[in-house]
Amino acid sequence: DGAQRAALPKRGDLVVAEASASQDLGPVLALPRSRTTGRRWGPRQMQGAAHRPDPSGRGMLNLDDGPASKDVLIVEHRLGFVMANAGVDQSNAADPHGPPLALMLPKDPDASAARMRDELHRRLGCRVGVVINDSFGRPWRIGTVGVAIGCAGLPAVLDLRGDPDLFGRSLQTSILGYADEIAAAASLLMGQADEARPVILVRGLKKDAPHQSAQALLRPAGEDLFT
């Protein structure tokens, strides 16, 4: 409704929405304290809530050893994302003085992005791309960054192999995580705390490449050097 009043977005724009703004959120998870580890959620809850049931070689890694890794589980989510605590997050989920709750990732972020794109077209008559983003930590790096967990109406990756560099040499391995780059840039404006900016409009980016879902950003297990 706000977009209609402001006559935004326009054809060719991109809309980046944080996971909590999508209409396909996973269930809210109650967090009884684990009797064995003291964390508010344990491996059984993680597996039941989000862990991919079919083995792919990555599985679940419990990082309980040492203070730096307290209360962390590295999990392959059922959507294919390898992430801390399966993306279960208490930030902005509920009043801290109320019962402990956490939000899970959307059930199907790509479908959420497609529905948002279609609804914007229905209401405004313009075709836009949509990225659903969430904050991820990164191995060997401090700090979280925005990552695309769903997208529709834009390329998720841009294959630059074969394109010339400044000196005419053909690029050999360069594949750009296009949707991730957009998600990270938008995350700077969204913020991580009480900024309350769940949707960001991106203008001026246009790439003539096949549209893909965010699944195109996932490296196949057979190409994973860490598996």
Describe these PLM feature segments.
Residues 1-227:
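N-terminal and secondary-structure boundary signal
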